[in-house]
Amino acid sequence: MSWTVPVVRASQRVSSVGANFLCLGMALCPRQATRIPLNGTWLFTPVSKMATVKSELIERFTSEKPVHHSKVSIIGTGSVGMACAISILLKGLSDELALVDLDEDKLKGETMDLQHGSPFTKMPNIVCSKDYFVTANSNLVIITAGARQEKGETRLNLVQRNVAIFKLMISSIVQYSPHCKLIIVSNPVDILTYVAWKLSAFPKNRIIGSGCNLDTARFRFLIGQKLGIHSESCHGWILGEHGDSSVPVWSGVNIAGVPLKDLNSDIGTDKDPEQWKNVHKEVTATAYEIIKMKGYTSWAIGLSVADLTESILKNLRRIHPVSTIIKGLYGIDEEVFLSIPCILGENGITNLIKIKLTPEEEAHLKKSAKTLWEIQNKLKL
């Protein structure tokens, strides 16, 4: 097949050569137009349309309109970020997964690795970029990136370095996904959830810290091990600050509705002959043990975050101990984020459960709030 197309000089009118540029523009791909920069001359070299495997295989039936779908973005592709990614993928929780990281080689490598495994998952669309535009229109954004504590560094200095990082991340997230929910995983999670709330100006229900969701899972697992019962049948809560100063609510621990405190009134105290308080000590020590042995924690927190993601995207209205603002509760007057039982759904945190605490448990919660507020008060936002 051969086509003849006139060469049009810049000095000539379109009508004088009988060429319709609008039609040409529609018919030709810009890459099939070669510019000759001589005397204002442009030369178009058309190429005949050739059949492709795709065109021979697929018959166009109708035009497709954009369909609303769910999208999750993860900021940070370190060990925690990738554990979150694979956990969400295996649960098939979203139609699209976007990954963001400044380490472009690692980002591309991790993404390709996941993409090649996508035939075994229910999420075929996995994208990545170091630019936040790839997160546009996310339903949920999970932040796992942040600075790590250096040897001898104060907690305040670590938080302040993370504030600088969060300022860049949050502004970009808000720009591209102004209606998303945020899950903060980076540590110290309670303070950084507060920072994300302040920087984003999002309503409080859309800012969620992973908080004590994992602490509570560890608590139930260890209780189950001690009793020889599956952890799903062990009901108990770890509240307050994620980490060393978390509060075990022994007054609420029960198995099949039987409160353990009814069987052992001193459970969880120094007077307890069975020393159940060691269960909570093990909860707080476990992370350090894992880090000592393998260098970091990843899988448990990844599965925990996927659990939160499922409750939000599927609007399950399940109860999770996540970090949220608790000003006005339990005698706390400061704007601090601590973990209490929250109902999670498509709007984020929809309701709080007013769990009854003993005076001792409430005192521990207030102490955590005071410690956090002393640090938050010194932050430069």
Swiss-Prot record:
Q: What are the UniProt keywords, alphabetically?
A: NAD, Oxidoreductase
Q: Which reaction does it catalyse?
A: (S)-lactate + NAD(+) = pyruvate + NADH + H(+)
Q: Does the keyword Oxidoreductase apply?
A: yes
**Catalytic residues (UniProt):** H242 (proton acceptor)
Which amino acids does the record list as binding substrate? R155, N187, R218, T297
Question: InterPro entries, alphabetically?
Answer: L-lactate/malate_DH (IPR001557), L-lactate_DH (IPR011304), L-lactate_DH_AS (IPR018177), Lactate/malate_DH_C (IPR022383), Lactate/malate_DH_N (IPR001236), Lactate_DH/Glyco_Ohase_4_C (IPR015955), NAD(P)-bd_dom_sf (IPR036291)
Q: Name the enzyme's class.
A: oxidoreductase
The EC number(s) given in the record are 1.1.1.27
The pathway this protein participates in, as annotated, is: Fermentation; pyruvate fermentation to lactate; (S)-lactate from pyruvate: step 1/1
Question: Which GO-annotated molecular functions does the record name?
Answer: L-lactate dehydrogenase activity
Quote the tissue specificity entry: Testis specific.
Biological processes, Gene Ontology terms: lactate metabolic process; pyruvate metabolic process
Among its keywords, does the record have Secreted?
A: no
Q: Where does NAD(+) bind?
A: D101, L102, D103, E104, D105, K106, R148, N187
Gene Ontology CC annotation, any one: cytoplasm
Q: Which Pfam families does the UniProt entry name for this protein?
A: Ldh_1_C, Ldh_1_N
NCBIfam families assigned: L-LDH-NAD
HAMAP family on file: Lactate_dehydrog
Task: Tell me which family the UniProt entry assigns to this protein.
Answer: Belongs to the LDH/MDH superfamily. LDH family.
**Protein name, per record:** L-lactate dehydrogenase A-like 6B
